[in-house]
C-alpha cells in the first residue's frame, strides 16, 4: 500500500483550498470543493487511459451528506489531523479506502500515479515523503505545508486587525443564524397551536357527525315502530324547537281562519237577514207565487206603519179565529174523514195570508235564537284560543 501517493493526492487537494493565512485548516463550507478536486484527479486519469478506475468515487447520497455538512456547519474549522475522523463519521468509510478501491486490479494506489498525472505539487515533497515511507514502513509522518506561510511577512497589527474583522463577521453571521432559528421556532410553535386547534375542531365535528348518525338511527327506528304499531307511544327525542315552531304556525293559521269567519258572520248578520227569513219559510212549506210580492211589500213599508199593521192583523186574526170554527162546522159537516186526515194541514195553514203571518213570527224567533247561538260560539272560540 502506497501511503505516499495518498498523502500526495490529499496534500494537493488541500493546498488548492487552504491558504497560508487561514492557519492550516479549511471551513466546513469547503468540504464539497475538496471532494470535487479529488474526484477531478481520478476523472482526468481515466480520460488519459493510463488506469482502469471505478468511477464515480462518491455516490449521490455521500455528496448530499457533504453539501448538508457545508450548509449546516459553514464556518466550522476542519484541521488536517481531524479530517479523517470527520470524513469517516459522514460516510462510514475512510477516504484512503475509497481511493484505493477505485483502482481495478490493484489493491492500493500506484506509486507513479501522481507523477503520471503531472500534478502541480512540489516534487521535493513527493520524494521526501516517498523516501520516508520506504525507509520506515508503518511509521506515519506529520503532514507539512508545501509553501512557506506569508504570515511572517505581515506585522502583528495587521494580523490582529484581520482576525478581528473575521471574528466580527462570524459574530454577525452567528447573530443572523440565531435570529433565523428563533423565527423558525416561533413559526413551529404557531403551527403546533394551529394543529391542536384543527385537531379539536376535527374531533368536535366527528362527535357531531356521530350524534347525527345516532339521531337518524333513532328517528328511523321510531318511524318503523310507528308503522308497525300505530298505538305505540312516541319517543321523546325530537327537536323541541321544530315542534314548537310547527305549533305556532298552525295556531296562527287557525287564528286567522277564526278571525275571517267572525268577520264573515258579522257581515252576514246585517246583510242577509231577509234572505234567512225567506230560506226558513221555504223550508217549512211550499208557498204560492204571491210570496215574492208580499216580501217586497213588507220591506217597502216603513217600520212604524209596519207595527201598526201588525197590531191590526193580530186583532183580525183573533176575530177570525173565533168566527171560522162555526163556519167550518157548517161547511164541512157532510164531508167524510179520509184515511190521511191526520196529515191534512191546519185550518189556518190553508189560508195563504194567515200562514204568512204565523210563519213570519216563527222565523223571527228562530233567527234571534240562531244569532244568540252564533254569539255564544264566537265567545267560546275566543276563550279557547285567547283572542
From Swiss-Prot:
Gene: MPS2
Keywords: Coiled coil, Cytoplasm, Cytoskeleton, Membrane, Nucleus, Transmembrane, Transmembrane helix
Subunit structure and binding partners: Interacts with BBP1, MPS3, and SPC24.
UniProt main location, coarse: nucleus
Tree of life domain: Eukaryota
Biased composition (Polar residues): 220-230
A single GO cellular-component term on record: spindle pole body
Region (Disordered): 216-235
The keyword Cell inner membrane is assigned to this record: no
A Pfam family per the record: MPS2
Record InterPro entries: Mps2
Described function: Component of the spindle pole body (SPB) required for insertion of the nascent SPB into the nuclear envelope and for the proper execution of spindle pole body (SPB) duplication.
Transmembrane region(s): 311-327
Bilayer topology term: Single-pass membrane protein
Compartmental location: Nucleus membrane; Cytoplasm, Cytoskeleton, Microtubule organizing center, Spindle pole body
Organism whose genome encodes this protein: Saccharomyces cerevisiae (strain FostersO)
Protein name according to UniProt: Monopolar spindle protein 2
Gene Ontology biological process terms from the UniProt entry: protein localization to spindle pole body; spindle pole body duplication
rRNA processing recorded as keyword: no
Amino acid at each position: 500500500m502506497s501511503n505516499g501517493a495518498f498523502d500526495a493526492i490529499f496534500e494537493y487537494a488541500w493546498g488548492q483550498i487552504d491558504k497560508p493565512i487561514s492557519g492550516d485548516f479549511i471551513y466546513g463550507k469547503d468540504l464539497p470543493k475538496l471532494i470535487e478536486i479529488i474526484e477531478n484527479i481520478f476523472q482526468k486519469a481515466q480520460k488519459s487511459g493510463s488506469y482502469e478506475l471505478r468511477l464515480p468515487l462518491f455516490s449521490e447520497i455521500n455528496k448530499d451528506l457533504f453539501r448538508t455538512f457545508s450548509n449546516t456547519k459553514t464556518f466550522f474549522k476542519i484541521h488536517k489531523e481531524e479530517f479523517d475522523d470527520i470524513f469517516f463519521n459522514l460516510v462510514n468509510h475512510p477516504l484512503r479506502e475509497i481511493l484505493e478501491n477505485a483502482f481495478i486490479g490493484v489493491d492500493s494506489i500506484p506509486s507513479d500515479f501522481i507523477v503520471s498525472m503531472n500534478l502541480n505539487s512540489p516534487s521535493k515533497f513527493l520524494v521526501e515523503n516517498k523516501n520516508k515511507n520506504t525507509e520506515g514502513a508503518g511509521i506515519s509522518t506529520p503532514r507539512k505545508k508545501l509553501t512557506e506561510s506569508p504570515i511572517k511577512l505581515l506585522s502583528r497589527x495587521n494580523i490582529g486587525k484581520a482576525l478581528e474583522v473575521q471574528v466580527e463577521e462570524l459574530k454577525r453571521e452567528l447573530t443572523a443564524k440565531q435570529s433565523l432559528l428563533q423565527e423558525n421556532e416561533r413559526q413551529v410553535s404557531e403551527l403546533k397551536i394551529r394543529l391542536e386547534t384543527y385537531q379539536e375542531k376535527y374531533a368536535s365535528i366527528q362527535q357531531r357527525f356521530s350524534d347525527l348518525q345516532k339521531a337518524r338511527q333513532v328517528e328511523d327506528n321510531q318511524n318503523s315502530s310507528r308503522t308497525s304499531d300505530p298505538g305505540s307511544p312516541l319517543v321523546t327525542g325530537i327537536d323541541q324547537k321544530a315542534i314548537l315552531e310547527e305549533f305556532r304556525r298552525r295556531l296562527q293559521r287557525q287564528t286567522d281562519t277564526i278571525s275571517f269567519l267572525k268577520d264573515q258572520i258579522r257581515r252576514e248578520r246585517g246583510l242577509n237577514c231577509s234572505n234567512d227569513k225567506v230560506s226558513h219559510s221555504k223550508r217549512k212549506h211550499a208557498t204560492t207565487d204571491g210570496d215574492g210580492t208580499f216580501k217586497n211589500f213588507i220591506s217597502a213599508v216603513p217600520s212604524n206603519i209596519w207595527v201598526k199593521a201588525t197590531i191590526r192583523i193580530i186583532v183580525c186574526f183573533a176575530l177570525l179565529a173565533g168566527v171560522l170554527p162555526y163556519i167550518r162546522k157548517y161547511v164541512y159537516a157532510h164531508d167524510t174523514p179520509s184515511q190521511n186526515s191526520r196529515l191534512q194541514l191546519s185550518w189556518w195553514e190553508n189560508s195563504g195570508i194567515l200562514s204568512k203571518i204565523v210563519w213570519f213570527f216563527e222565523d223571527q224567533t228562530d233567527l234571534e235564537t240562531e244569532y244568540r247561538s252564533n254569539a255564544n260560539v264566537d265567545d267560546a272560540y275566543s276563550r279557547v284560543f285567547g283572542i
